[in-house]
């Protein structure tokens, strides 16, 4: 059984596990916390690369993996049950000190109040899921080569609730979903989550009445089963008679986990020969009939299998939904780390122990490896060792696990026997073993007990059988068995040949390098790992065996296709001699016209689809040993240069993590033949640019050309680029176009260009946005250095590849491409509520006005900023983002942080497709200009189901904090308070002025509040209830201080109550402080002022003129009879809208269903001209409510932004907030 550990997504999910194979950290329940507090605390351990809190015990016993898993399943179910109930807040407070989990960059604080369930699927272990887009018309999964979809059909990321969504092409709901992926990646975990979620009523209840889960390796133990017996095995508790269950087959879901594990052939039978559902038949025949739709053709199925096993599974599987599990994102790897060690509540390990080693962090993308690494650290803690892991491969990590787990060399003989058992099981495709199997192999009773205790073996609770803790662990032991056998063989060549024959027979030559056993075997043939094996088994291995076995497995290098499996094997081996010999012998042409291996060779350009950080790491590692001169990591929508052959193009449809960037750039430190690197179209963070420039400064880096077009670079990145240019870098050509460098950034580049050590000869920049002074400076540089050419136009040799009929790459000029695509550079005028991005403004949709929920659909990769909210997103692809306005009081109340931290910005509940957002800028209102606030005091608070997490932002700017590679939950900026400073924190504040006309009298309301969009919106809505309209006036220029008081005064005799305002923070749900000002006659105008009460200096002044008092969009409440009628915006401008709206049909589409019925919609559309349509629409609007007119205004704003802005400006510039 291939099962993996999955960790909880920290923004919205709590891990659920119920399998013998699930490997997940234990979660603390309330009862466990009470029990933990009652324990006495021993003295702390010495601090050696380990941050220990008082109370950590080094005497904790080894817990078998099976026991740990059962405990985790119990705790996970309690977490699910607990999430459905609202805990009593006072009960938590009465328990005393709230336990805390610390790491260097994050702090987790258990809840002191219940967290409401934000959405249905928050309790799931978070795994990255890629739904593949298979070639149209394909009716079989079997292909000449088994590879993810071709580059043009990359697929898209989905969530667990989307597994059975309709196909985008056919709109049909799938009956067959295949969950595929690499070994240990989390396929079985996902399958069990689906079953568990259905049991809990959280998933697919509207589609399936019965869901049955089957472990295929356990089913394979049965000789024969009837359909009725199969259904009975798939239910923990019988829910209905079999006849009743089978009466509605379209409401049934069968989950077959690990269908590729048993050594069976699933053959469909003749439908005419199908037996009755109560009659037994061979299990493989029964399952084959289910898959072939000979029985229950209307039922749905979900299969899990390794990707490489699918082509030989069955002859045909129709057109399934194929979903690939890609493992953990970088954030979830970190989250898993401290969740794992949460079971030792008083122990915390600095995550930098792992995070500072990017290779280790990348390996942890695979959940099983993540568990393995944490287990090694835990064993080191228990044995009192210094915590340190230097493993660069999964093989090395497995050996480390073995050396820490096996108690001494006295078990070496039994360990050999266990390896033989593993190899025999792999060859026979067996993962379950009886007690007699173990004894026949030569395992003693005490050895079996020891292996069970340390967690290498586990006993199956449903039978008397045994298995390895994970299938990957069995494959690792099998690999060791082949090393041990060959070392004992008298005739080494014969032993090598037999080993290779066995592996080819088991996996096939085509998939040989995809098999984990082969990868482990190559890893064990590394010199360092063989020495480690010698220590474990207390023996010596002849080095001749190693070399001959390597040659036997790899074969002739020039006969091997260049694909991911071989790259993985070479990476595991790490031997420079083998890498060089193999990589330099690769052919540069395709082996045939139909050859679509993981790479496609075309005109000396290798193409490779990579989906994960692990794949990117192994490929770039191997490339450095090859003839490849040019490397392109293809970003979406990028324009491209012609690469110098031989070249390789990597296609990647999922986000690249920070750790992966570090590994990639680390591999560039010694590039051998690589001279060109194109990263255009890939968003690069500040830290990624720093890693890149560090690599370019290394003497072994031979890169001469670097393209960074449209990579989201800012002026902050230019300091690294300038330093790199000044450090004797070999770089001769640098392209930085389509980046927001600004004058400051370009000036920093100029400093690097002036350095005599700079070898750059071509620099491409966007100069249109630069000031004349900076452009002059650039021209002066060119004049001073004749070898330097600075350009801002695309060079003639820059081309974009297209496919011709022969499948070869043809080159099209960018000018021709632009002519074909037409003029797409018209930028529509937008408003402050829109998100401004590469293509202009993107409208924000109102999802639920009462709940303050909004949605924006960002159309392409790039950077987007909303002036109204201050939010800023950097996205890698088109994505829909939902934004909710929250109140801190709902989450922060009564936590310890309310005394140690202050709110520093608005709180948002953001939801977005996982991995699509590489950075988010969260606004704050703390003033940094005076240098009185240390930016290290800023934290971003995430409110999650298991508590609140404080994360340190990547950087803090004057108006926002930047969080890179974020996961989303209710989140906002907090500032840690320093006792000596108290509450005297400089604040960026705003003044809000509202007025209402009543006959000739005017009432003003004046607010002084922090610059928080959620507070502003709450005040807008409150004032709107009483027909008050806001006037836009400039805010105070200087920073103000929380707790300070200010005197309100006027240039005329008016009544002001109260006459003092205090600047304070109040949650949006609380009443805000304001002064009410009564004016009998405004005359020519009135001057309002705010003066600091303590120092008597003027901090704000505004002139209110009669022209400011033009009504716009007040909500019509029960106005007095004598009050002037305040018309809605659309009614005020009816004549202009009828005359100037030029595109009515898109407007009607937005109103359809919200305001217009189907009949109204068709009636308006039937009119002949746009003006007649608008008149008809206005005639119907007489019966509309104010909310309907609000929808009308919003639709006009989205379809005709120029017109609406023009009307707003002519009406006096009164702010409109809907």
From Swiss-Prot:
Q: Where is this region: UPA?
A: 969-1118
Q: Composition bias, kind Polar residues: at what positions?
A: 7-29, 799-815
- An individual GO BP term: positive regulation of inflammatory response
Q: Domain FIIND: where?
A: 835-1118
Give the start-end ranges of region ZU5.
835-968
Activity regulation reads: Activated by cleavage by B.anthracis lethal toxin (LT) endopeptidase. Cleavage by LT promotes ubiquitination and degradation of the N-terminal part, releasing the cleaved C-terminal part of the protein (NACHT, LRR and PYD domains-containing protein 1a, C-terminus), which polymerizes and forms the Nlrp1a inflammasome. Nlrp1a inflammasome is inhibited by DPP8 and DPP9, which sequester the C-terminal fragment of Nlrp1a (NACHT, LRR and PYD domains-containing protein 1a, C-terminus) in a ternary complex, thereby preventing Nlrp1a oligomerization and activation.
Identify the Pfam families for this entry.
Answer: CARD, FIIND, LRR_6, NACHT, NLRC4_HD2, NOD2_WH, UPA-FIIND
Give residue numbers for the site Cleavage: 968-969
EC number(s) given by UniProt: 3.4.-.-
State the source organism's domain of life: Eukaryota
Listed under subunit, the entry gives: Interacts (via LRR repeats) with BCL2 and BCL2L1 (via the loop between motifs BH4 and BH3). Interacts with NOD2; this interaction is enhanced in the presence of muramyl dipeptide (MDP) and increases IL1B release. Interacts with EIF2AK2/PKR; this interaction requires EIF2AK2 activity, is accompanied by EIF2AK2 autophosphorylation and promotes inflammasome assembly in response to danger-associated signals. Interacts with MEFV; this interaction targets Nlrp1a to degradation by autophagy, hence preventing excessive IL1B- and IL18-mediated inflammation.
Q: What is known of its domains?
A: The leucine-rich repeat (LRR) domain may be involved in autoinhibition in the absence of activating signal, possibly through intramolecular interaction with the NACHT domain. The FIIND (domain with function to find) region is involved in homomerization, but not in CASP1-binding. Autocatalytic cleavage in this region occurs constitutively, prior to activation signals, and is required for inflammasome activity (IL1B release), possibly by facilitating CASP1 binding. Both N- and C-terminal fragments remain associated.
Indicate what this protein is called per its UniProt record.
Answer: NACHT, LRR and PYD domains-containing protein 1 allele 2
Q: What species does this protein belong to? A: Rattus norvegicus (Rat)
What taxonomic lineage is listed for the species of origin?
Answer: Eukaryota, Metazoa, Chordata, Craniata, Vertebrata
């Amino acid at each position: 059984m291939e099962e993996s550990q999955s960790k909880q997504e920290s923004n919205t999910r709590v891990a659920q596990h119920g399998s013998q194979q699930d490997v997940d950290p234990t979660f603390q329940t309330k009862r466990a916390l009470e029990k933990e507090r009652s324990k006495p605390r021993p003295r702390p351990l010495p601090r050696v690369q380990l941050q220990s809190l008082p109370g950590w015990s080094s005497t904790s016993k080894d817990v078998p993996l099976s026991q740990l898993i059962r405990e985790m399943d119990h705790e996970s179910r309690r977490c699910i049950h607990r999430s459905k109930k609202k805990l009593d807040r006072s009960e938590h407070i009465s328990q005393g000190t709230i336990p805390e989990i610390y790491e260097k960059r994050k702090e987790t604080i258990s809840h002191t109040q219940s967290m409401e369930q934000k959405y249905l699927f928050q309790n799931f272990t978070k795994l990255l899921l890629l739904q593949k887009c298979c070639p149209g018309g394909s009716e079989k999964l079997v292909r000449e080569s088994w590879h993810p979809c071709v580059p043009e059909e990359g697929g898209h990321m989905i969530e667990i609730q989307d597994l059975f969504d309709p196909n985008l092409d056919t709109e049909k709901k799938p009956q067959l979903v295949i969950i595929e992926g690499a070994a240990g990646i989390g396929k079985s975990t996902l399958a069990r989550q689906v079953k568990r979620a259905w049991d809990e009523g959280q998933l697919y209840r509207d589609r399936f009445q019965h869901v049955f889960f089957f472990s295929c390796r356990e089913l394979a133990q049965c000789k024969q089963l009837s359909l009725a017996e199969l259904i009975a095995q798939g239910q923990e508790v019988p829910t209905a008679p079999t006849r009743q269950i089978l009466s509605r087959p379209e409401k049934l879901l069968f989950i077959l986990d690990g269908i590729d594990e048993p050594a069976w052939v699933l053959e469909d039978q003749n439908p005419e020969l199908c037996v009755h559902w109560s009659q037994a038949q061979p299990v493989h025949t029964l399952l084959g009939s289910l898959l072939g739709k000979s029985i229950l053709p209307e039922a749905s199925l979900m299969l899990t299998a390794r990707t490489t096993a699918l082509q030989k599974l069955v002859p045909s599987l129709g057109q399934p939904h194929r979903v690939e599990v890609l493992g953990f994102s970088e954030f979830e790897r970190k989250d898993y780390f401290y969740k794992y060690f949460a079971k030792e509540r008083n122990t915390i390990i600095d995550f930098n122990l792992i995070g500072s080693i990017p290779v280790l962090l990348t390996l942890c993308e695979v959940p099983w490896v993540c568990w393995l690494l944490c287990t090694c650290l835990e064993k080191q803690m228990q044995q009192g060792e210094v915590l340190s892991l230097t493993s660069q491969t999964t093989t090395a990590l497995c050996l480390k696990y073995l050396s820490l787990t096996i108690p001494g060399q006295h078990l070496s003989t039994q360990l050999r026997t266990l390896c033989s058992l593993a190899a025999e099981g792999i060859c026979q495709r067996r993962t379950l073993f009886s007690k007699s199997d173990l004894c026949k192999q030569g395992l003693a009773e005490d050895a079996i007990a020891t292996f069970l205790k340390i967690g290498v073996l586990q006993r199956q609770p449903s039978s008397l059988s045994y298995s390895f803790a994970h299938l990957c662990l069995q494959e690792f032991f099998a690999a060791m068995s082949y090393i041990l056998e060959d070392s004992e063989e008298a005739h080494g060549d014969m032993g090598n040949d037999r080993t290779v024959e066995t592996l080819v027979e088991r996996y096939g030559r085509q998939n040989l390098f995809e098999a984990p056993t082969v990868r482990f075997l190559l890893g064990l043939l590394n010199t360092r790992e063989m020495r480690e094996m010698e220590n474990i088994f207390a023996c010596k291995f002849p080095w001749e065996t190693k070399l001959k076995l390597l040659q036997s497995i790899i074969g002739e290098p020039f006969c091997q296709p260049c694909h991911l499996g071989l790259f993985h094997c070479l990476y595991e081996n790490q031997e420079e001699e083998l890498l060089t010999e193999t990589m330099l012998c690769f052919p540069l042409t395709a082996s045939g016209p139909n050859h679509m291996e993981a790479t496609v060779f075309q005109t000396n350009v290798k193409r490779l689809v990579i989906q994960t950080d692990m794949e990117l790491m192994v490929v770039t590692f191997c490339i450095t040993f090859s003839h490849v001169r040019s490397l392109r990591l293809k970003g979406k929508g990028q324009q491209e240069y012609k690469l110098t052959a031989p070249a390789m193009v990597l296609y990647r449809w999922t986000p690249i993590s920070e750790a992966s960037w570090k590994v990639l750039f680390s591999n560039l430190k010694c590039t051998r033949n690589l001279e060109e690197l194109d990263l255009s179209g890939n968003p690069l963070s500040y830290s990624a640019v720093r890693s890149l420039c560090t690599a370019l400064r290394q003497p072994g880096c031979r890169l001469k050309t670097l393209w960074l077009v449209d990579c989201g670079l800012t002026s902050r990145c230019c300091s690294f680029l300038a330093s790199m240019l000044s450090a004797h870098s070999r770089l001769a050509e640098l392209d930085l176009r389509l980046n927001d460098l600004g004058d400051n950034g370009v000036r920093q580049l100029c400093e690097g260009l002036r350095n005599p050590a700079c070898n750059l000869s071509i620099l491409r920049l966007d100069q249109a946005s630069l000031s004349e002074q900076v452009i002059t400076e650039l021209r002066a540089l060119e004049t001073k250095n004749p070898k330097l050419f600075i350009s801002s136009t695309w060079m003639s040799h820059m081309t974009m590849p297209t496919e011709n009929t022969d499948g070869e790459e043809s080159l099209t000029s960018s000018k021709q491409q632009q002519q074909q695509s037409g003029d797409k550079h018209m930028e529509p005028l937008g408003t402050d509520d829109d998100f401004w991005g590469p293509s202009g403004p993107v409208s924000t949709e109102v999802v639920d006005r009462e709940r303050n929920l909004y949605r924006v659909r960002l159309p392409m990769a790039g950077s987007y900023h909303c002036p109204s909210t201050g939010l800023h997103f950097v996205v890698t692809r088109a994505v829909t983002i939902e934004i909710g306005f929250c109140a801190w009081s709902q989450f922060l109340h009564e936590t310890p942080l309310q005394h140690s931290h202050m709110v520093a910005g608005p709180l948002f509940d953001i939801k977005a497709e996982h991995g699509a957002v590489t950075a988010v800028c969260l606004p704050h209102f703390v003033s940094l200009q005076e240098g009185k606030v240390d930016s290290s005091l800023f934290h971003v608070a995430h409110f999650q189901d298991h508590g609140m997490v404080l994360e340190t932002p990547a950087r803090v700017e004057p108006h926002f904090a930047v969080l890179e590679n974020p996961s989303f939950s209710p989140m906002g900026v907090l500032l840690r308070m320093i006792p000596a400073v108290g509450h005297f924190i400089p604040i960026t504040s705003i003044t809000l002025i509202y007025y209402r006309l009543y006959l000739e009298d005017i009432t003003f309301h004046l607010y002084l509040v922090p610059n928080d969009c959620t507070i502003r919106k709450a005040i807008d809505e409150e004032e709107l209830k009483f027909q008050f309209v806001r006037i836009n006036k400039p805010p105070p220029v200087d920073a103000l201080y929380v707790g300070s008081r200010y005197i309100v005064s006027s240039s005329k005799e008016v009544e002001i109550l109260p006459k003092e305002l205090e600047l304070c923070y109040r949650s949006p749900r609380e009443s805000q402080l304001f002064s009410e000002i009564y004016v009998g006659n405004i005359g020519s105008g009135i001057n309002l002022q705010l003066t600091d009460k303590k120092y008597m200096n003027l901090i704000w002044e505004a002139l209110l003129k009669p022209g400011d008092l033009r009504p716009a969009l007040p909500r019509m409440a029960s106005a007095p009879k004598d009050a002037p009628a305040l018309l809605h915006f659309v009614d005020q401008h009816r004549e202009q809208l009828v005359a100037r709206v030029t595109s009515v049909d898109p407007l009607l589409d937005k109103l359809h269903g919200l305001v217009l019925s189907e009949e109204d919609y068709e009636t308006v559309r039937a009119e002949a001209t746009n003006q007649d349509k608008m008149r008809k629409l206005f005639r119907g609007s007489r019966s509309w409510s104010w909310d309907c007119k609000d929808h009308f205004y919003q639709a006009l704003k989205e379809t005709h932004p120029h017109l609406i802005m023009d009307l707003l400006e002519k009406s006096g510039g009164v702010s409109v907030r809907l």
